[in-house]
């Protein structure tokens, strides 16, 4: 990917009120995107958002920009990111736009685009939009201005789509499920999907107020879900992030089940059913335990760069159908075009029901190696990873680990953070000490 001025690995993101997440910038972005997308013929755009209070302001700005370029907008209201991808396909819209900062706090927001086929916008189109941003905004003739409307049945359409990914001969009648929607975009979707498939559902994180999205709940903080699963004696817990493209789970014993374990369960079930095509794609952050467990099953495994767009690229290159990040982005190309927390959760529930096994038992074939991740914030105007001291400390740790572990240092694609990951088969306290040693060097350099 070439250097961009605005687009990162997952669209454009930042703090609301600071450039680029300002009303004037987003209006110009809508206009620039409209000018580029209008070249392809269709003049219809789907716009969805999560539950952040700033979503109202930003969707109005986007719609004004699109209208000035002659494109019409169809609003879905609060809707998971994968739902917008699905609706973009079914409405044959030229593009889908999601207003969300995913797992970030409410004061952040972002804009990301989907193509007509429900996949992330290609690099060359994003670059064309950036080029258009440099031009002065002009308005089409009055008769050619875009219009706006609401898709009143958007939620119902997506609920039926999700249910269709669960086998019709099975039901969730025997399961008691706690679902945590992070006070985000799945709050009015996920509970309905699970209830309509027969489950007894207890909800948390389903009362968004515009400011409580991802706050001590959802896929990035499952402590509340763990407590509730144990208190309710539930069979399983599902946690989504603010825009519904990530999934974390909790077993009946209160143990967290991450994206690596979810990928393992889905891959193994695909193998059992004779439906697995090729292998599975993880990332540089995927636990070595996943790689070893898949190898034992004879399932090929490759690592992509971190970021769901890179997982998808690797899947497409290989012709494989399943991939995931340990953060909970799970992509199942036989069912969806992008990461979908609800659909991924339904595939794990399918394995539980079909095999009469608990989530804990389904995870038992994979042993997670201790993996410590430390996030170090830096000023953003230089790269601490180029520090000689950081390189020297990293070499020392790698020498201590030998072939029993690995070190990964990388810059976040969305925030001014250096992520320090150390993994190995030593005791967790030993691995943590190694990670903190490197993190201290990064802090000193930052």
From Swiss-Prot:
- Pfam annotation, one family: PGM_PMM_IV
GO terms for biological process, alphabetical: carbohydrate metabolic process; peptidoglycan biosynthetic process; UDP-N-acetylglucosamine biosynthetic process
Query: Which major enzyme category is it?
Result: isomerase
Q: Where does Mg(2+) bind?
A: 102, 241, 243, 245
Q: Which residues carry this modification: Phosphoserine?
A: 102
Q: Which family does it belong to?
A: Belongs to the phosphohexose mutase family.
Protein name per UniProt: Phosphoglucosamine mutase
Q: Which organism is it from?
A: Yersinia enterocolitica serotype O:8 / biotype 1B (strain NCTC 13174 / 8081)
């Amino acid at each position: 990917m070439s250097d961009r001025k605005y687009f990162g690995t997952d669209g454009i993101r930042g703090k609301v009120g600071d450039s680029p997440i300002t009303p004037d910038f987003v209006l110009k972005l809508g206009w620039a995107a409209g000018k580029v997308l209008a070249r392809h013929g269709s003049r219809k755009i789907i716009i969805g958002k999560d539950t952040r209070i700033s979503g109202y302001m930003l969707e109005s700005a986007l719609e004004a920009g699109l209208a000035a370029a002659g494109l019409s907008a169809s609003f879905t209201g609060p809707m998971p990111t994968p739902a917008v991808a699905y609706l973009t396909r079914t409405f044959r819209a030229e593009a889908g736009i999601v207003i969300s900062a995913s797992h970030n706090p409410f004061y952040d927001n972002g804009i990301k685009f989907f193509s007509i086929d429900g996949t992330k916008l290609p690099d060359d189109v994003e670059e064309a939009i950036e080029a258009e941003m440099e031009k002065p905004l002009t308005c089409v003739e009055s008769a050619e201005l875009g219009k706006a409307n609401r898709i009143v049945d958007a939620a119902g359409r997506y609920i039926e789509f999700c249910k269709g990914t669960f086998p019709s001969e099975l039901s969730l009648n025997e399961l008691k499920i706690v679902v945590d929607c992070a006070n985000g975009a799945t709050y009015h979707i996920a509970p309905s999907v699970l209830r309509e498939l027969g489950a007894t559902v207890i909800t948390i994180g389903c009362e968004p107020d515009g400011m409580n999205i991802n706050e001590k709940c959802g896929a990035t903080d499952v402590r509340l879900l763990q407590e509730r699963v144990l208190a309710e004696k539930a069979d399983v817990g599902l946690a989504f992030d603010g825009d519904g493209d990530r999934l974390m789970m909790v077993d009946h014993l209160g143990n967290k089940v991450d994206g690596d374990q979810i990928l393992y369960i889905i891959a193994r079930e695909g193998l059992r059913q004779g439906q697995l095509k090729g292998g599975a794609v993880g990332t540089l952050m995927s636990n070595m335990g996943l790689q070893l467990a898949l190898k034992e099953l004879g399932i090929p495994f490759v690592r992509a760069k971190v970021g769901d767009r890179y997982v998808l690229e690797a899947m497409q290159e290989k012709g494989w159908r399943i991939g995931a990040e340990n953060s909970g982005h799970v992509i199942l190309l036989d069912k969806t075009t992008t990461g979908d927390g609800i659909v991924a959760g339904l595939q794990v529930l399918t394995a539980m029901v079909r095999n009469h096994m608990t989530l804990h038992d389904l995870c038992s074939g994979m042993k997670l190696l201790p993996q410590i991740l430390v996030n170090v914030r830096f000023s953003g105007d230089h790269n601490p990873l180029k520090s000689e001291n950081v390189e020297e400390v990293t070499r020392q740790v790698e020498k201590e680990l030998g072939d029993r572990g690995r070190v990964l240092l990388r810059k976040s694609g969305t925030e001014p953070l250096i992520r320090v990951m150390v993994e190995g088969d030593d005791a967790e306290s030993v691995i943590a000490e190694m990670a903190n040693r490197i993190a201290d060097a990064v802090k000193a350099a930052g």
